[in-house]
Curated annotation (Swiss-Prot):
This is FAS-associated factor 2. SUPFAM superfamilies: Thioredoxin-like (SSF52833), UBA-like (SSF46934), Ubiquitin-like (SSF54236). Residues 275-350 form a coiled coil. The keyword Acetylation applies. Plays an important role in endoplasmic reticulum-associated degradation (ERAD) that mediates ubiquitin-dependent degradation of misfolded endoplasmic reticulum proteins. By controlling the steady-state expression of the IGF1R receptor, indirectly regulates the insulin-like growth factor receptor signaling pathway. Involved in inhibition of lipid droplet degradation by binding to phospholipase PNPL2 and inhibiting its activity by promoting dissociation of PNPL2 from its endogenous activator, ABHD5 which inhibits the rate of triacylglycerol hydrolysis. Keywords: Acetylation, Coiled coil, Cytoplasm, Endoplasmic reticulum, Lipid droplet, Unfolded protein response. Its main location: cytoplasm. The modification N6-acetyllysine is found at residue 167.
Length: 445
């Protein structure tokens, strides 16, 4: 059953919670979760912020002060290797040791009292981290000025960034905390850390992060790792999905001994990295497979959607076509109906046909486009428009036509035009008592 602090958490958040607790040493799971939630589960920002919360210094992300960061150094799973300073040998050595003992005691006592009193006058500037990367670069430059440029490759980034890179790359992270005032620091850096075989091992097998405890960034990491003496080295790696301190090396260690201890720690914990690497590969393969399945599903979905879209477009095209045909049919019906009504109206408005005995009458024989003939009498005084209206009212006549005379061959102006605003009468048009006129179909023109 999950702990109360881990309820309602995703797997990724649970892993970050456990990793944050392991790196900071905070025993309360509630406090760890609260801190991570304040930083939106950004573990790098949370760890860096915890390193800033020392002795009343405000947090960058959380203004209320908090207790100093702690690391559980009593974990029996952490491999520890401590090199003690050699005891004096012989009468001369013991004599020198006894003579110097009071001076050393007095010196360190006065130094501690001075530092303690100074804390009340001026807060320790190391409590405020303003430029963590600048602290690393500054330490590297001072290291090279003092011990030369032949040294392991320094990680130029914050402690939290180094942790994240080691986790992402599944590599060991070796952390070195430099005590400037310690008597063994110079000898360790010059003879051990800068030894060619040590440089080769560190550069090829792990990331190397180092800083002086006199720098704010180094001091914060020192508060987290809680070294007992200097020189101090801590080996950190991803273990059980958490960045974990798996080895601590303290004291003046010689190059061969350092290589043996680092190799032992790596060999003892290599299986965790191999296991994590296999799990990552499996997760990546699962993710790739899921992505391929999702892509195949999306491709199939897009294909189905495209088919459905084409079907809809085809249905819409057919619907519009049918609607267009129907509209055309209705329009044609309306046109024919209007035409028929117009024919009937023209027929009703025609003047009576003159009698054959009327000397002012004209007998006209019309030859229609279908070769049929129609005969009717008109009065000389009537307009040519009457002839057009008569032909228009006939069922056999075309919808649009013109009337032509044969001798001489000409088109009769039966309808108003620019040349003939008022069509002439039959007499004015020069028609005789008997005429044959031809009806020419203009419907398709």
């Amino acid at each position: 059953m999950a702990a109360p602090e881990e309820r309602d958490l995703t797997q990724e958040q649970t892993e970050k919670l456990l990793q944050f607790q392991d790196l900071t040493g905070i025993e309360s799971m509630d406090q760890c979760r609260h801190t991570l939630e304040q930083h939106n589960w950004n573990i790098e920002a949370a760890v860096q912020d915890r390193l800033n919360e020392q002795e009343g210094v405000p947090s960058v992300f959380n203004p209320p002060p908090s207790r100093p960061l702690q690391v559980n150094t009593a974990d029996h799973r952490i491999y520890s290797y401590v090199v003690s300073r050699p005891q004096p040998r012989g009468l001369l050595g013991w004599g020198y040791y006894l003579i110097m003992l009071p001076f050393r005691f007095t010196y360190y006592t006065i130094l501690d009292i001075f530092r303690f009193a100074l804390r009340f006058i001026r807060p320790d500037p190391r409590n405020r981290v303003t430029d963590p990367v600048g602290d690393i670069v500054s330490f590297m430059h001072s290291f090279e000025e003092k011990y030369g440029r032949a040294h392991p490759v320094f990680y130029l980034g914050t402690y939290s960034q180094a942790l994240n890179d080691a986790k992402r790359e599944l590599r060991f992270l070796l952390v070195y905390l430099h005590g400037d005032d310690h008597q063994d620091s110079d000898e360790f850096c010059r003879n051990t850390l800068c030894a060619p075989e040590v440089i080769s091992l560190i550069n090829t097998r792990m990331l190397f992060w180092a800083c002086s405890t006199n720098k704010p960034e180094g001091y914060r990491v020192s508060q987290a790792l809680r070294e007992n003496t200097y020189p101090f080295l801590a080996m950190i790696m991803l273990k059980d999905r958490r960045m974990t301190v798996v080895g601590r090396l303290e004291g003046l260690i010689q190059p061969d001994d350092l290589i043996n201890q680092l190799t032992f720690i790596m060999d003892a914990n290599q299986t965790y990295l191999v296991s994590e690497r296999l799990e990552r590969e499996e997760r990546n393969q699962t993710q790739v497979l899921r992505q391929q399945q999702d892509e195949a599903y999306l491709a199939s979905l897009r294909a189905d959607q495209e088919k459905e879209r084409k079907k809809r477009e085809e249905r819409e095209r057919k619907r519009r076509k049918e609607e267009e045909v129907q509209q055309q049919k209705l329009a044609e019906e309306r046109r024919r109906r209007n035409l028929q009504e117009e024919k009937e109206r023209k027929l009703e408005c025609l003047p009576p046909e003159p009698s054959p005995d009327d000397p002012e009458s004209v007998k006209i024989i019309f030859k229609l486009p279908n070769d049929s003939r129609v005969e009717r009498r008109f009065h000389f005084s009537q307009s040519l428009t009457v002839i057009h209206d008569f032909l228009f009212s006939l069922k056999e006549s075309p919808e649009k036509f013109q009337i032509e005379a044969n001798f001489p061959r000409r088109v009769l102006p039966c309808l108003p035009s620019e040349e003939w605003p008022n069509p002439p009468t039959l007499q004015e048009a020069g028609l005789s008592h008997t005429e044959v006129l031809f009806v020419q179909d203009l419907t398709d023109e």
